[in-house]
Amino acid sequence: MENTVLFTAEERSLFFQLFKRLRNDSPEMFEGDRYRTLKHHLAVIIGQGRFHRGMFNLNPIIRSMQTAILSAEDIGLKNDSLIACLLMPYITTEEELDDIDRLYGKNVKVILHGLIHIRELYKKSPSVESENFRNLLVSFAEDMRVILIMIADRTNLMRSIKDTTNDEAKLKASEEAAYLYAPLAHKLGLYQIKSELEDLSLKYMNHDAYYLIKNKLNATKKSRDEYIRRFIAPISEMLTQAGFKFHIKGRTKSIHSIWQKMKKQKCGVDGIYDLF
């Protein structure tokens, strides 16, 4: 029988932290009738026994709040999308959408309708890693906010499953993150999220390669930071003298990107010289 404990002590503490953060991200969502409606709606859903931790034993309330926060802070999604994030684990059939339209408006209904379509597409497709599936997914979504929420949810999932004992499910989630969600994030200009998805996928799919590169980067961080500082200094001075307002950034390639170069060039970490 599935564990249906609503909150562990740790989850309860995390819930209040996330609630405060989400309220700061979208204060209008916590004002007036809409918030009271959402609060009551979620309470009814949970009271009906529609609280499922799933194969990774993750609390769906915590997960949906984390996805909403990531959607707001890292992607810039607004109120309607965040409400859809919070309702996403529970609204699974089109029959429920009329109530969503009445309670929250057309935008939330459209987003949840797209998410339901994507779930149906997942069930029908034998392989989600192909370019054809990515194109099909975008067309099924109908609204780009659906794709953005899916990317946010998968990023949140990848952050959350590091301690899971379900290795088969973790591997499948990692493959989908690497071959489906990371390319979608790249196409939409979410480069930091794309790199994070790729790095976490490598961490779970090839633990040894990930930590080989990570440990090497950690060991050489001081010298790399100094190299970047010395490289930027004369450029910064010239731009300042010319009267420009500017900001220069420098960063190391992602672990996944370094690993791809190692495979392509058939060399170790020390054989990769363009780390920046």
What annotation goes with each model-predicted range?
Residues 72-80, 103-106:
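Short, solvent-exposed loop/edge-beta patches enriched in aromatic
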Residues 82-86, 150-151:
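Acidic beta-strand-to-loop metal/phosphate-binding motif
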Residues 54, 77-84, 96:
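Short N-terminal amphipathic alpha-helices
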Residues 84-114, 118, 166, 190:
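Hydrophobic or amphipathic alpha-helical targeting/insertion segments
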